[in-house]
Amino acid sequence: MSVNVYDVAYDLEKALRHSEEYSTLKNLYDEVNADESSKRMFENFRDIQVNLQQKQMTGQEITQEEVEQAQKTVALVQQHDKISQLMEAEQRVSVLIGELNKVIMKPLEELYGNPEEN
């Protein structure tokens, strides 16, 4: 019996969309975006985060000034209740996706072995 992995992947996508973790994330995201000041603060945080990640991935140096700005921004958003909750919800969804990825990669790990165990 042949399984269409794409159909299963779309079923997994639907399951993720209906999960408690995603539902919580979406609700918090909508709440943050409903308030203009919260939305601007969160967008600023995300812009800084993405910029630093891109620099890191391309091997560009991150300046001390950028590190300090990022630290100040993180401290600021952590004080904002809804944004802090949103970041926690993002982390929970990220953990869930990581766990799903482990399940998906299991056949290849069994075939080739797990490089983390060597």
UniProtKB/Swiss-Prot annotation:
InterPro entries: Com_YlbF, YheA/YmcA-like_dom_sf. It comes from the Bacteria. Pfam families: Com_YlbF. Belongs to the UPF0342 family. HAMAP family: UPF0342. This is UPF0342 protein BPUM_0928.
